[in-house]
Amino acid sequence: MNNKISNYLNKAKEIILIVLSFLLPCLLMLFLFKIENIYPFGDKTIMMIDMQSQYISYMRYYKSVLEGNKSMIYTLSKVFGGDFMSIFTYYLASPFNLLIVFFSYDEIPAFFLFTNLLKMSLAGLNMYLLIRLQKEKGNFIDLIFSIGYGLISYSVIYLSNFMWLDGVMILPLVILGIDKMTKKENNIIYPLALGYSLLSSWYIGAMICIFAVFYFIYKYISLDKKFKDRNYFILRFFVFSLIGGLISSCMWVTAFLHLSGTKASFSLPQPIFYNFVMILAGFGQNNYKSVNDICTNYGYMSMFTSIISLIFFQLYFFNKNYSIKERIASFVLFIIYLFFSSFSITYTLLHGGREPTWFPCRYAFIIGFMVCYFGSKETDHLSKTNIFGPILPLITGISSYFILKNLPIEMPSEEKLNYEISMMSLIIYFVVIFLLVCYFIFIRFKPKYNKYVKYALTFIFIPLTCISSFNGARNVLQVNDKQYQNIETYKKDETYLSSVEKIKSLEKEENYRMEMLFNRPGNYNDIDNNPMFYSYNGLSHFSSSENKQIEDYMLKLGFHYNGYFEKYDAGSTASINSFLNIKYLIDNTNNYTNNKPKFINKYPYQELTNNDNDGLKYYTNSLTLPLGFASDIMPYEWFQDNERNGNSMKYYNHFEYQNSIYKSLCGNILNENNEKKDIFYKIQPLSISLSEGVIEELDEAGHKYYTGKKNSTVKIKYLVPQEAYNFNLYFAEMNNNDKLNYVMDYNYLENSYWHKGIKGIKDSNSHVHELTMTFKEDLNHEIINESFYYEDTNILKEYVNEINLQGVNDLVIKKGITSFSYEGSFNLNKNNQQMFFTLPYEKGINIYIDGKKVHTYRTGHIFTGANLENISYGNHKVKITYQDKGLILGIGFSFIGLVGFGFSIVYYNKLENLIFDSKKRKHK
């Protein structure tokens, strides 16, 4: 009877511990969100920085995919179109994101909060399971590390980088799996956990894989000399790592094959050492003092897991229950990560071979994990700690206090904030050390009371851990308070969705692109991801997975691109809008900026009837080309003869480039001299005046070079010719040189990191315009190619009407599991034609004419073309299909991985024994 009661109580205790390991981090964070007024408990959301500008847009688009409105494989809601899986695998692959179907669009901020809360709570639970499943029974003292890891400062700081928290959550199970394989107890946990880490985020998963290798080496070194299964362990680690990698191949293989040409390319920095003291400060409660800490690429990391776990971590190295070899191996593993974090080359390698842009040390949770994991080993055998063990944390605490209280006077005040001492943490730190010293002394003389004293300490330490972790998390939320987006701002963003839906109601989305001439209020850093936020076919976009060649081409066409994000901005020209099938524009007249297109007020644009009273206006372009059409066969790239200097670009002219696009597409729009007509014509200067000391030089091609001091000016007057009076005027500095300020008729023409590209100019009554270029710094033989052009929309109309005769009509979208297609029809009426789609060419794209596959290739620099040489005149069916070959390959590998996993469950141990037993027999 007593045994039954004892078993019942033990089971009840185990259940309580499991529940508490999940519930305590959950309740602490819920209470914190409540008192800090985080939505849905208040008016602030956890959205900040990239979540504002990127992730919220991707999540909204993903929701539309799950609702069946958009394709998972291909999207036209970024730049000129392209695969969606590169975005999905990097940002959205977590299975938790499927829960978005239970939230409305206006509840997505709450979705982010609750899924992050769930991941953090599961991180606490998984840490407890890691500790518990390596011994006979669980103890309440284990909750110290469950709470500490669940509320690790890394997770709270990076709440807005929601896709990284899956890695924090799953890491304890990866390590549990390795430990279980060591003992030949379980081969299932490791491959599933490793596979999940790579599936949910291949980026963070890769960091976990690197740590798994280091941990395997640590574990191997730590094995007792009498351990007979070393070779078994090596084979198991290799085989089940392979299986875990294969299971998740559908994500990381797909991502890898899409990475070529993106920002994810391999690039090592110059070898330098970072501030090591700043890195050590990451273990402190108050280490996060400014959003600027994470708006840097290196030198900062945060891995605070409560002040108490840090004490036990230090004591672990004095615990006699563990061999000296194991403790040294643990210490080396920990130091390796600290050293790697302080040296630029190894730091970059741990990030996959490319230094992160903002959000430094993205693997810092691994270091916090080690603090909790090795600290938990200490509490398992607390009584075996050397009585002098507390000296180390005592010295650490005292020396840290005096060092931080006497920081160099010359240290910047902002940097000093990161070393600010938390008095509460300091008190808890020394109280815990004092209690532990008392404990070690007491059990030395009264060992039989060890169990009861340890229980008493446990129920002191758990509340102190809650206080310490809670304060650390609260510090982060309070620092981020002004950065967090207000829910009302998000709701304001949501109101513009109805405007997009009005355009969509006019005709099928397949037939056009559209853009918004203003950014939603909730964007960050002027980044524009409106096409994905509102799920329309548009150009503006920013993600880390976009192809660099396509981004560069945005700038080439006269749009904005600064090396990071691309956007419609001032809209380039009416001709390029027509070329790219941009048929509709939405403007907010309450949002005034000079970085808006001027061509909307002239032909071929006209304002649609609008009954709104919210300042919104809708415009339609009557001269748009369809998404696909038959055209003259053209070269891979469009260049003018004077643009080349050997193999490099010397001089580039947006307007002449746009002329060449249309002349290449259609060769029968001719002038009286039987020459192809231009759409753009240069307006020649009336006069040029240089301020004192400015030197102007011309090279053999007529390109201008300037030398002069800062604040010097060059003034150029233009007279618009009479034939251009009713046409659009444009200005561009062809090299996008941001070393000068440009002012046209007292209007600032911004050419900066935030706004580049072609700018529209409003004509004056006098038709005289003055450009003033002011040097922002000293210039020495700097090439400046300013150009002032007008656009003859009558000639544009000729080109568009002629090309439209062979346009693809009645487009229909077909969505498959791994494919996406446009289907339509066109009428071929010329010889020597190609099919041309303003969709970027990439592997997996094919064009079919009347059901037959034709040779498909890259044309027009980045676009997709197919030869129509053997196609007869008349009506034809056309289909352009994108098949994600990376996804197909990844799914194939995942299937192999799942089969291998199933096979290993049944047969692995038998095969392993067979292999090693046969070797033993041969050896004998």
Language-model features, listed with the residues they occupy:
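Membrane-embedded helix bundles of polyisoprenyl
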Residues: F22-P25, L117-Q134, N139-S222, F233-G261, ...
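Membrane-interface coil-to-helix junctions
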Residues: P25-M127, I147-V168, M207, W252, ...
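Membrane-interface helix-loop junctions at the exits of transmembrane helices
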Residues: L30-I38, F96, F102-D106, F140-N161, ...
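Extracytoplasmic/lumenal acceptor-recognition loop(s) of multi-pass membrane glycoenzymes
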Residues: K78, P463-I487, K504-F579, L625, ...
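Alpha-helical transmembrane segments at the extracellular/periplasmic loop-to-helix junctions
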Residues: A93-S94, F276-N319, P360-V371, S422-L436, ...
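Contiguous transmembrane helix-bundle modules in multi-pass membrane proteins
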Residues: E185, I204, I328-Y347, R354-K492, ...
